[in-house]
Every structure is written in C-alpha cells, then in structure tokens.
Amino acid sequence: MTRTVPDRVTDVGNDLTRVAGSFLHSATTGDWTACGFCALPVDGYSLCPQCLSHRRTGLPLADRAGFLVYADEPSSQTYRMMRGYKEPRTRDTFEPIVEALLAVGLRGHFTCANKLAGTNDSGWTVVPSTRGRTVFVDLVRSLSTAPDSEIAVSHVGPKPDRVLNPASWAIAAGETLPTHVVVVDDAWVSGASAQSLAVTLKQAGVSEVSILSVARVLSPRWDENKPFVKDVLPTLSYDWTICPWTLGDCP
C-alpha cells in the first residue's frame, strides 16, 4: 500500500490479521504465472482457458478484476468460510470475517478502482444471489459509504454456468448509470456470473466496470492449481494492505 487509508480500515485490517491471518492467504503476485485477468495459476499462458473463452465471445467484458484472498476447495478453512457465512448454522462463525474482508476491500481500496478507471463518477452493485439470499448484499450495503450510488440489479434469467449470459440480469428501470461501476461478488469460480453482469452494465452504457471478489476459488480439477495449492499457497500470508486490483501496491 502506498497511500493513507482511514484509521478505522487499519484497525479492521490489523484485527482481521490477528483473528484469521492463520488461514487467510492474500491474492498476490510472485514467481509463478497467473492469468492476467483472474489470477488463476496457469502454465505459459497470458489468460486461463475460461477467461480466454469469455474474451472470444466478443462481448464487452469488465475492464479489471480484483481479489482479496484465495480459497482452495474443497476443505480449506477459507473455502468453508465462503460457504458457511451464508448458512444459518455457521453464520456467526464466518460472517464477521467476510464482513471484515469486505470492509478492507471496499473502504480501503474502492478508490483504487476509481483511479484505474480514471474517474470518480462511480457506482456499485452486487451480483444477485440466484437463490434469493440477501446475506452478501446486506453486508455490502452496510459497509457502503455511498448508498445512493447502488445500481439495483435483479436475477431474471437462467444462472450463468461458465458460459456468459447477460440476459440473466436486469438493471432496474430508471437507474441513472455512472461512468464506472464496481461489481461486488463473494467468490469467483469461473467468473461467468460477474462477467455476465459486467456485460449487462456495459451494454446499458457503462464505460468502465471493475469486479471485486472476496475470494478467488482454486479448484483441484484444474491441474495448474495443484502444485500452487501444495507448494505456494501455504507460503502466502494475509496482508490486508495488498491492493486487490494490482495484487501489489495501490495505484
């Protein structure tokens, strides 16, 4: 981090490190090759197959994506957290950690997205739950310093499942769209849901879209993840000052 953040963000980041730093791993860069868009470990490619397939559609995609932590499925504590914060039985355990991660990402690094987009004319929205859950959107709303800047979006079509489907989402009638929208999502697996919403926003006239995901999920079904999860991930500590957009210093 190369800029000053509010003291409250610093307090939250330090508390988060103390409480959950033993199992959280910051998304960052290092001496491995990662997809230039979604931070997935790759071998000799600039984009992972999923992001490449998105690009080949010719649809107007998000301009950037940011990630706070890695979550390797199926049994890591971070992966359990990203599933458990939505469940009544485990919510009390995991929701405060997800909330703290969001606080760091939104209050500490929202302005980084604005800087990369080249504008302060920004709004935000949340990828709607296809199951009607409101846990995540409620967390984001509680942390927003600009509630009037929310772009209301609803789920109206089939869930995007690895394939982009901008018809899955609808922007509320009468919304005044800003130049730049930050799309907030809890977890990036294939990126299809968040990217589909980015397409919807761009087709409606938004110039710049930034996607902020709390967790970049690493699947054991992708071979390149296996050595990364085994050898690299355990060496990555949690550092709340890492910018989710650059995976390094703030822009």
Q: What annotation goes with each model-predicted range?
A:
Residues 95, 136-137, 194-195:
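Conserved strand-to-helix beginnings and helix N-cap segments that scaffold or border functional pockets
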Residues 154-251:
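PRPP/pyrophosphate-binding module of the type I phosphoribosyltransferase fold
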Residues 124-127, 182:
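Acidic beta-strand-to-loop metal/phosphate-binding motif
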Residues 11, 18-25, 31-123, 146-177, ...:
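Active-site-facing substrate-recognition patch
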Residues 122-125, 209:
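Residue-level signal for inorganic ion chemistry
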Residues 135-146:
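Short, aromatic/basic amphipathic alpha-helical patches
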Residues 126-136:
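Glycine-rich phosphate-binding loops at beta-strand->alpha-helix junctions
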Residues 1-16:
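N-terminal alpha-helical interaction blocks
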